[in-house]
């Protein structure tokens, strides 16, 4: 028996991927059975962070040391992550959600459909308002795009109106949200998006 929904979380270093996973676990774990797989190149830093924050019981969080390029471990050769997901699904059957957090990567990052059912891509305004129009699979093809840290827009000179216009053009109708995960802005909308994708049955 597999989990109902495997959700990939990708994005550049520092965009807010771990903050998103932390927030979703804390917000959803009373109503859903959840587990997490994190990716780091040489450490298990993100997994340890989530464990120390007590977002879930420790056994539900697995850290994968990819030892190389982050996108290889979620796309070309996702065996390490797939095995971690299967371990969690076997141990905590049934699971509603398994979140797979990629290591920080560039705009070319994308998940193998063998690993996840849907993907969330996280960028943030501190990288500049030009990021959405640069495109890439995360911007254009992810199931949900988040533009995080909008509270920093004025401080870094990012124009949210430009980001909105460019994002709507690049996404072609696919969903996206402005978020400020540190304050909780956008979290309810993300949860509703995830809940809307839970299948009735998945073998």
Swiss-Prot record:
It holds the Pfam family cobW. It is found in: Cytoplasm. GO terms for biological process: urea catabolic process. It comes from the Bacteria. Facilitates the functional incorporation of the urease nickel metallocenter. This process requires GTP hydrolysis, probably effectuated by UreG. HAMAP family: UreG. This is Urease accessory protein UreG.
